[in-house]
Amino acid sequence: MQTRNTFSWIKEEITRSISVSLMIYIITGASISNAYPIFAQQGYENPREATGRIVCANCHLANKPVDIEVPQAVLPDTVFEAVVRIPYDMQLKQVLANGKKGALNVGAVLILPEGFELAPPDRISPEMKEKIGNLSFQNYRPTKKNILVIGPVPGKKYSEITFPILSPDPASNKDAHFLKYPIYVGGNRGRGQIYPDGNKSNNTVYNATATGIVSKIIRKEKGGYEITITDALDGHQVVDIIPPGPELLVSEGESIKLDQPLTINPNVGGFGQGDAEIVLQDPLRVQGLLFFLASIVFAQIFLVLKKKQFEKVQVSEMNF
C-alpha cells in the first residue's frame, strides 16, 4: 500500500512539474515574440516627435524607403485599406541575436488621424481578410486607437502589409470633421542597431575606444571577440568586446586610431517613413456633386434636342 502511495505521489509531482514548465515556456515565449513593438511603446508616449521624425529611427539608423497607399477619399463609417510596402532584396540575410545569419523581419507603425481606428473583425470583408493574412495588429496605447503597430513579422511573406481601417462618422463623433487629413507611416526591415537603453546590438559596426596597437585578439567560444589595444606611449591597455556577428577588420599588430572601425557594418536593413493624405468626404456633398453633374448632362441633352428641333424647323421653312 505504501509503495502504491509513493508511486502515486511521484506521478503527481512529475505531472505538476511538466505543467509548470509548460506554462513558463508559453509565458516567456509570448513575451519574447511581442518584445519588439514594445521597445518604442515603452520608451515614447507618442511615436512621432514634434519634428515629424518617427522614433523608430532612433534604433534603426540606416535610411530605407517605405510606401503607403490609401484611397483619396472615404465616406464616414467605412472600412478601407491602408497598404504599407516595405521593399528590400529578399536574398539578403541579417545578423541574428546569436550571431548567425537569418531572414529579415519587418515591422510598421501607422499614425492615423484622430477618430480613425482598426476595423473590427465583423466589418472586414473576406477579400480584405485574405490580404491581411495572419497578421495581428495592436494599438500603440490603449487610449490611442488611431496609432497601430505590427511586427516583427517575416519579411518574405509580409513586405506588403494591409491595415483594415474604419473611418469615423462625424454624426456620432463630434471630434471628427469632413476634412483632408494626413496619415504617417514608418516601416523597418531587419533588426535595429541600438537598443532603447542606448546599448549597441550586434547588428552594427564597432569602433575602437582607444588609440594604439592591437596587441591581442581572443575569439570567444560562443562567438565574438576580445580585442586588446595597447597604448604605444604609456603601455596601458583597453579591451574592446565584440559580440557574435560582426566580422573583424583589424588584426594583431595593427596600429589603430580612436573611433576607427574594428568590424564591418553587418546591417542590411533600415527604417523609412512616409505620409499620405485622405479626405473624409461628406455624403451630402457627393450627392450634390452627382446632382450637379446629372443636371449638366440633362442640359446638354436638352440643348442637342433643341438644336435638332430648330434645324428641322429651318428645313421645313426652306421647303415651304
Swiss-Prot record:
SUPFAM superfamilies: Cytochrome f subunit of the cytochrome b6f complex, transmembrane anchor, Cytochrome f, large domain, Rudiment single hybrid motif. Keywords: Chloroplast, Electron transport, Heme, Iron, Membrane, Metal-binding, Photosynthesis, Plastid, Signal, Thylakoid, Transmembrane, Transmembrane helix, Transport. PROSITE patterns: CYTF. Binds 1 heme group covalently. GO terms for cellular component: chloroplast thylakoid membrane. It is a single-pass membrane protein. The keyword Cytoplasm does not apply. Residues 1-35 form the signal peptide. GO terms for biological process: photosynthesis. The 4 large subunits of the cytochrome b6-f complex are cytochrome b6, subunit IV (17 kDa polypeptide, petD), cytochrome f and the Rieske protein, while the 4 small subunits are PetG, PetL, PetM and PetN. The complex functions as a dimer. Belongs to the cytochrome f family. HAMAP family: Cytb6_f_cytF. This is Cytochrome f. It comes from Gossypium hirsutum (Upland cotton).
